[in-house]
Amino acid sequence: MNNFSIISEYKPAGDQPKAIDEIIAGLSSKKRSQMLLGITGSGKTFTMANIIERTNRPTLIMAHNKTLAAQIYSEMKSLFPKNAVEYFVSYYDYYQPEAYIARTDTFIEKDSSINEQIDLMRHAATRSLLERRDVIVVSSVSCIYGLGSPDLYYQMMVNLEPGQSYLRDQLLNDLINLQYERNDIGFERGCFRVKGDNIDIFPSHYSDKAWRLSFFGNELEYIHEFDPLTGEKLAKLDKAMVFGNSHFVMPQETVNNAISGIEEELQKRLEFLKSQDKPLETQRLNQRTQYDLEMLTETGSCKGVENYSRFFTGRHAGEPPPTLFEYLPEDALLFVDESHVSVPQIRAMYNGDRARKKVLVEHGFRLPSALDNRPLKFEEWDKFRPQTVFVSATPGPFELEETGGTVVELIIRPTGLLDPECIIKPATNQVEDLISEIQTTIAQGFRVLVTTLTKKMAEDLTAYLQELKYKTSYLHSNVHTLERIEILRDLRQGTIDVLVGINLLREGLDIPECGLVAILDADKEGFLRSEVSLIQTIGRAARNSAGRVILYADKMTKSIDKAVSETLRRRQIQQEYNEKHGIIPKTINRAIHALAEFEKIDSKLDKKQAHTLFDNPAKLKTHIDKLKKEMLKAASNLEFEQAVKLRDQLKTLEAAALELS
């Protein structure tokens, strides 16, 4: 068994050693919930990593959106290169759930686009949890949604070992039951092909490696890992475990039992609808369900099979669905990052899902059992979660109640950076004053973040600043993923000096070059100007030793008073620590340097691969098309650095293709 091992030049410092010891002591004393109050720049992720290494327990880290999940995943991946660090988020690029609008008699069919790369990573996550213990899974709230039963998923697994005998036809049939597709021409993930005595399998958890099974009669002689693009052998394997190409694979016996259960519920529901004098709903439900039953009988699956998941897992009505939490071992550890946002999000998921499906059931589009294909209720999540460490700079009421108000503080930054100075100015003529402050900040070589209350004001302010010749951009929810990383990179590199936003300039935005955060209309109490929102926004200036925050307000609200007081308290604690240890605060610009190096190195193709591609125009075109798809997938998956890298590779290859033509 592998143990967790951090590979880093840094050691815990500041508040980190004390926080790590306190959390581990709490875990050892069987505390179910603990609160890690970690401010911006205090090294929350590094602290979590050290807790994982010391406890040596499989870990799930929940974040409230894909951006933060991807950021934590990337950091954990670099800290634990020898261990399994996995990524588990929703695999939909686009998702329109089926719905019915009664007032207009409009039925909206389910429409979705699955991101193959994320689907691959989800399979890698569940596979790692079933195969090993040194696993860290970084997930969004997607982990509370229904997933295939881990028992069936493991039961259906095909175990392959050289020297063992396998009936060829039975093995091929087993692969088909795992929802692998036989394709002797287009060999891609989730497919297998047969060539003479060889069977090639492209596993669901790989994108660039496949397995070749070499037989002599019925005996499996060798298993080789190879590159599906070039055919080059990469390694010889002692064994291989083939898991399902879907998390909803199941043996035929389970399918047959489920069909019986569905038929029984269908008859009861049809009788009920008839008794309610609903002939249209009766006919609709019978037609739709009979079609699904026919598909299940013939193929073992159907469109929307997840709506019948209760029958496949043998659960009763109202019981929680299997989720990623059932794949976790009993001694697993859970971190809930930015818990002040994540916990309310978990609480809200169930009600929204049920309201939509209830309409579908009432109007004969689905059986009542579809209501059991759902996310966990908050109470169920609370029951299933293992020992938990909530992490936030601004803990919410649930976390404080669970921990009895006791928090483990992570306030002192090893870098010595102070919380920013907070200045309160009148909101009257705030734009004119802001322009003066922007000039001062830009002259110092820093960048400016401005947060407004409305989209209209953000757009107008951006246009006004651009008219005044300030290099300004507007970050909003409609900005595509790749554009977002380009905007942030342009801001860091100085192509943009001012970035205007509404609610996107809070958690997870790491801009060390930011010398000023301006909060317009700070005295307008509400969600965007609450104590939590203000503290999070103020934290955006905490990466810069000269960082300042200006709150434009005509009156002192309770939120402003509490946020500024808490910031001052943290600032004083850091100042005392710096004086005691002789630390001079200094801005660290390591991240942008690392990004530049990342692009510089990875934009270059492997020489051997480039030579092969450039000598074959047809193969070059195929590779260009493949890279375009991967770039779009990376962008949708919020893997910004990967998307930029692929874009730069594409430029090189397209230039080469033009020369060859």
Swiss-Prot record:
Annotated SMART domains: DEXDc, HELICc
GO-annotated biological processes: nucleotide-excision repair; SOS response
Coiled-coil positions: none
Cellular component terms (Gene Ontology): cytoplasm; excinuclease repair complex
Positions that bind ATP: G38, I39, T40, G41, S42, G43, K44, T45
Domain Helicase C-terminal, chain residue ranges per copy: 430-592
Main location (coarse class): cytoplasm
Domain UVR: 621-656
Protein family membership: Belongs to the UvrB family.
Protein name, entry field: UvrABC system protein B
Source organism per UniProt: Rickettsia peacockii (strain Rustic)
